[in-house]
Every structure is written in structure tokens, then in C-alpha cells.
């Protein structure tokens, strides 16, 4: 299924990262926090301003982003894969 988010929404797939302690010990999955990095899969057309103009989003498909994981981030299953749908304002940075 193809998904097209509306307005300033962004669809993100979590990017799992191996977690190690400072001493080099790999943490098991249940001892790790969920990563707050992901790959942008789809973006909406943009934020609608009070003037009625549409401001395009700063992120684009393929970007690796760092985001706030919490209230306002919707988890959905698309074709058996968990994705996150969030507002662009929930994205803190683009990793380059």
C-alpha cells in the first residue's frame, strides 16, 4: 500500500541502531530505549499558513531524521511494517 500523508505530516520508519555501553557491551533489545532516528518514507504537501499559502516541508523522502517520540506520534502498520506518522514539528533535526 502506498501512503500519502496530509498537510505537514511525515511518515517515518524507525532505524534500529546497535546500542553499546561506554565499555563496549552490547545491550539486549529489552534494555534499550526505542531509537529516535528514522528514515522519511513520505511527506505531505506542506503546512497551511494563516494567509492560505502552503509552506513546503523542510524534510524530504530519504532523509534520516531525529525526532521526539511521544505524544502526537501515531504508530501504524502498513503492509506489516510499523511506521510512525508525525507532524514536521516533531522532527528535531536531519542527520547529514
UniProtKB/Swiss-Prot annotation:
Positions of transmembrane segments: none
Compartments in which it is found? Cytoplasm
| Keyword Cell membrane appears in the UniProt entry | no
Name the principal localization, coarsely classed.
Answer: cytoplasm
Q: What's an example of a GO molecular-function annotation for this chain?
A: metal ion binding
HAMAP family named among the record's database cross-references: CH10
Q: What name does the UniProt record give this protein?
A: Co-chaperonin GroES
Q: Which organism is it from?
A: Chromohalobacter salexigens (strain ATCC BAA-138 / DSM 3043 / CIP 106854 / NCIMB 13768 / 1H11)
Amino acid at each position: 500500500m502506498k501512503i500519502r500523508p496530509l498537510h505537514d505530516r511525515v511518515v517515518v520508519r524507525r532505524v534500529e541502531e546497535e546500542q553499546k555501553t561506554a565499555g563496549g557491551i552490547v545491550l539486549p533489545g529489552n534494555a534499550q530505549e526505542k531509537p529516535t532516528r528514522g528514515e522519511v518514507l513520505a511527506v505531505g504537501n506542506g503546512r497551511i499558513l494563516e494567509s492560505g499559502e502552503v509552506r513546503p516541508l523542510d524534510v524530504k523522502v530519504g532523509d534520516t531524521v531525529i525526532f521526539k517520540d511521544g505524544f502526537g506520534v501515531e504508530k501504524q502498520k502498513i503492509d506489516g511494517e510499523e511506521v510512525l506518522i508525525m507532524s514536521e514539528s516533531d522532527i528535531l533535526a536531519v542527520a547529514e
